[in-house]
Amino acid sequence: MGSVLSSDSGKSAPPSATPRALERRGDPELPVTSFDCAVCLEVLHQPVRTRCGHVFCRSCIATSLKNNKWTCPYCRAYLPSEGVPATDVAKRMKSEYKNCAECDTLVCLGEMRAHIRTCQKYIDKYGPLQELGETAARCVCPFCQRELDEDSLLDHCITHHRSERRPVFCPLCRLIPDENPSSFSGSLIRHLQVSHTLFYDDFIDFNIIEEALIRRVLDRSLLEYVNQSNAT
C-alpha cells in the first residue's frame, strides 16, 4: 500500500496538505501500522486503494488525480481511476481506537474525521477541517437530464429510474480520461454499484459476506469430496 500503510511511507506530502500536515512534514517516517493518508496526513477518511496498491482518502486521491494528470501522488504511476474501496482498511479502522492528538479523547479511527471536525482544540489550533475536493464533480442523469453531484447519481437512479430500460451512457465514465462510456440497457444501476460505488461498507454487512464465503468454501469442499467418491 502507498499511504502510510506502505512500508516506504516516508515521502513528504504535496503542497495541498492541511495545516497539521505541514507541521508534521519533518517527521522522518510514519509507522507501517498508521492509518494516516499520505496526501493530507490526517486519519484516512473513506479509504480507497489505487491500482498501484497505495491507500488514500477518497477526496484526496480524487483531487490529486485531477490536479496531477492522473498519476499517483506517491509513486507517480499512471492511474486510470481513483481505485477501489479499501474495505479491509475500513473494517480495521472500525475496531481500532486512538487518542485525539489535540484533546486526548479516545476515538474510533473510523470516526476520527468526524471528531476533529468538532474538536474545539483542533479548530482553535488549525481552523475548521477542510477536505480536499469537497465540491463534488457534477454530472447529468442520462434518463431525466437532471444535474447532480456524482455521489448522488446512484441514489437518484434507484429512487426515480429503477424500472428504466432505455440504453444510456454512463455519465461518470465520461468524467474519467481514456474511459469508454459504454451504453447500458437496463443495467446502469448495477454498473454504478459495481464500478462507481466506493464505500461498500455502507451497504454490506461484513459478517454476512464472511459467512457466505465460508459456506461457499464448505460447499465446494463437499462437492469435491462427492466427485472423488463417485470416481472411485
From Swiss-Prot:
Compositionally biased region (Polar residues): 1-10
EC number: 2.3.2.27
Stretch list, region Interaction with the RING-type zinc finger: 109-113
PTM info: Autoubiquitinated, leading to its subsequent proteasomal degradation.
Positions of Zn(2+) 2 binding: C52, H54, C72, C75
Positions that bind Zn(2+) 1: C37, C40, C57, C60
UniProt xrefs under PROSITE patterns: ZF_C2HC_RNF, ZF_RING_1, ZF_RING_2
Annotated Zn(2+) 3 binding sites: C100, C103, H115, C119
CDD domains per the UniProt record, alphabetical: RING-HC_RNF125
Tagged with keyword Ubl conjugation: yes
GO BP annotations, alphabetical order: adaptive immune response; negative regulation of RIG-I signaling pathway; negative regulation of type I interferon production; protein polyubiquitination; ubiquitin-dependent protein catabolic process
Lipidation (N-myristoyl glycine): G2
InterPro entries, sorted: Di19_Zn-bd, RNF_E3_ubiq-protein_ligase, ZF_C2HC_RNF, Znf_RING, Znf_RING/FYVE/PHD, Znf_RING_CS
GO cellular component: Golgi membrane; intracellular membrane-bounded organelle; VCP-NPL4-UFD1 AAA ATPase complex
Chain ranges of zinc fingers (RING-type): 37-76
Keywords annotated in UniProt: Adaptive immunity, Golgi apparatus, Immunity, Lipoprotein, Membrane, Metal-binding, Myristate, Transferase, Ubl conjugation, Ubl conjugation pathway, Zinc, Zinc-finger
Protein topology in the membrane: Lipid-anchor
Gene Ontology MF terms: ubiquitin protein ligase activity; zinc ion binding
Pathway: Protein modification; protein ubiquitination
Catalytic activity: S-ubiquitinyl-[E2 ubiquitin-conjugating enzyme]-L-cysteine + [acceptor protein]-L-lysine = [E2 ubiquitin-conjugating enzyme]-L-cysteine + N(6)-ubiquitinyl-[acceptor protein]-L-lysine
Region of interest (Linker region), ranges: 120-128
Comment block on domains: The C2HC RNF-type zinc finger and the linker region stabilize the RING-type zinc finger, leading to promote binding of the RING-type zinc finger to the ubiquitin-conjugating enzyme E2 (donor ubiquitin).
Subunit text: Interacts with UBE2D1. Interacts with VCP/p97; leading to recruit RNF125 to RIGI and promote ubiquitination of RIGI.
The protein, known as: E3 ubiquitin-protein ligase RNF125
Species this protein is from: Macaca fascicularis
Lineage: Eukaryota, Metazoa, Chordata, Craniata, Vertebrata
Gene expressing this chain: RNF125
